[in-house]
Amino acid sequence: SGALSSDRLWHFEPKSFIRHFRKCSWLDSDVIEKIMVANTKSTEKLQISKISKKVTEYFGAINTIINKYNLYSVNRKCHFLGQGAVESESLLSMQEVSQQQLIENGVHKGGAIVGLSTKKESDLGHWYGELAEEKDDYFSGKKYNSKGNLITGSYSWINGNCGDVDAQKYRGRGFKMLTGLDTYSSYWVYRGWLSINDFDRYWWDDPQYKKKNPPKMKKRFPQIDSPQKITENTYNCLDTGGFFIVGFRGKTVRIMDGDKNGKVDDNQVIENVTSAINGGYKGLAERKIFTKKAKEVIGDDVE
C-alpha cells in the first residue's frame, strides 16, 4: 500500500529543504535588526532601541523593494542592506544632515551637526532651505570632518544642480541618499511625477550652464517643487534606493552577483560594490562590517 510502518522514519532531504525554503525571500525584522546594529556596541542600549524602532517601521518597505527590484538573491540582499545601512545610518537618517564648518588656527574643521537639518521635512512642512532663513552653506561649500579632513566639495554645480539653492534642495535623501537634480528628475519621471517633455535632457551640457549662468541657458532644466517627497513615507525612502542601484548603477548588480560561495574575497567584492555605487570608498570599513553581518545572518550556502 506504500504506507509507512511505525518503525520507519520519513524526513525532508536537508539540502533540498533549505533550497526550497530559501525561495521565500521575505526577511524577518529580527534578521534586519541584527544587520542594522552590527556596528553598534552591545552596551549602547539607547542606540539599539532607536534602531530597533526604525527596523519595525521600515522592514515591510525593505522587503517590498528587495522583491520589486529583483534583489532577493542572498548576495544582492546582503550588499543592498550592507550598503544602505551606512548611507542611512542604520535607518536612523533618511536625509543628509549638515555640519557646522569652522576655521581653527587656520585649519578648516567640521563642528556640531546643524539641528534643523536633522528635522523631518514633513514636520517642517516644506523642504529644508525653502525659507530664506534656512539657507545652509554646508551644501554649497567644501565639507570637512571634525579632524580637518576634506569630505567632499560643493554640490552647487554637479549632478545637474543649477547653483547654491539646488545644492541644498537636492541634498541626499532616502536609503541610498539620492543626490542632485539629475537623479531626482530621473526618479520623478519614473514615478510619473514629472514629464520628460517638461525639460531638456543633458541640460548640463548647455554652454551657459558651464558658465554657471542658468538664466541664459537655452536648455530647460527640470523644476521640482517638493523634493522632500522622497522621505514622506517608508516606501519612497526605500524605493529610491532600489531605483538608484538598478536604474543608475546597473553594473552594481552584476558585481554583487560575482560574490558567490566564497570563491571571491569578501573584502574585494564589497570594495567593488562600494565603488560602483559611490564612485569612491567612503565609509568602506563600515560597509564591510554591515555586509559581512548580513552574509552571516542571511547566507546559508548549500553545496
Where are these regions (language model features)?
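Short, hydrophobic/amphipathic alpha-helical patches that form generic packing surfaces
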Residues: 177-181, 239-247, 275, 279
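Internal mixed-charge
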Residues: 229-243
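A general structural signal for short secondary-structure junctions and capping/turn motifs
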Residues: 162-170, 232-235
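Cell-wall glycan-active module
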Residues: 1-158, 162, 190-197, 202, ...
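Alpha-helical structural motif
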Residues: 58, 170-171, 180-183, 237, ...
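Amphipathic alpha-helical interface segments
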Residues: 167, 171-187, 191-198
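Short runs of predominantly hydrophobic/aromatic residues within well-ordered alpha helices
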Residues: 76-80, 171, 175, 234-238, ...
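Active-site rim elements
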Residues: 224-232, 278
